[in-house]
Amino acid sequence: MNNEKESALTAMNTNGRSKLTALLYKTLMSFVGVLVLSMGESFMLAANMGMDPFTSANLGGSSLLHMGLGNFQLMVNFVIFIFVLFSDRHMIGIGTVINMVLVGYEIQWFSAIRQSLFGTANSLTLQIINAVIGLIIFTYGASMYMTANVGVAPYDGVAPIISRWTHLRYRVVRVIQDIIVMGLAYLVGGPFGILTFIVAFCTGPLIEFWTDKVNQKIYNLI
């Protein structure tokens, strides 16, 4: 009888350690994904052909208030985070915190590194090269961070909540959300261009490609 209890306790402890190890690996996966995503954003910023709607709006707002992107985006994320927390706290996880705190600062950091290594993209060819590299890296990082499944960015949590409240399809709500934020980005003078539309409406298939071919396999190993 005692041996059975000891075996059960051992199994429970082993299972607990396994879950903790898996969580740590998934957190690391989310962290690396956000790091890669931010690197991609820095190349898109250098291309000067627009940014994703949320970052574009934050860049415009931070410029108007003479603040760094990291500080401004953190404040905006915190406001959205409070909304998501009280609306559906199940969407919050360690990945939420990683994304909301780090992305703005990492874009600043990678932009400085990219500038020192490669200089300014002062021709259309260099702009296109930076845009393509940025999109590839950005979508891979976005796929990795989302596949880790340890919480969504505050901005990404808004559409599912509104969709549930209004009974509208998620895709419809997300498109409306991105269009509103694109309009805001334009009004505040954020980087606005072809990349803004591409990131908002056309990167889904590339993110799915990275998820199916690479990141889901990494997640399954975890």
Show the residue positions of the predicted features.
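Core subunits and conserved enzymes of cellular information-processing
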Residues: 2-222
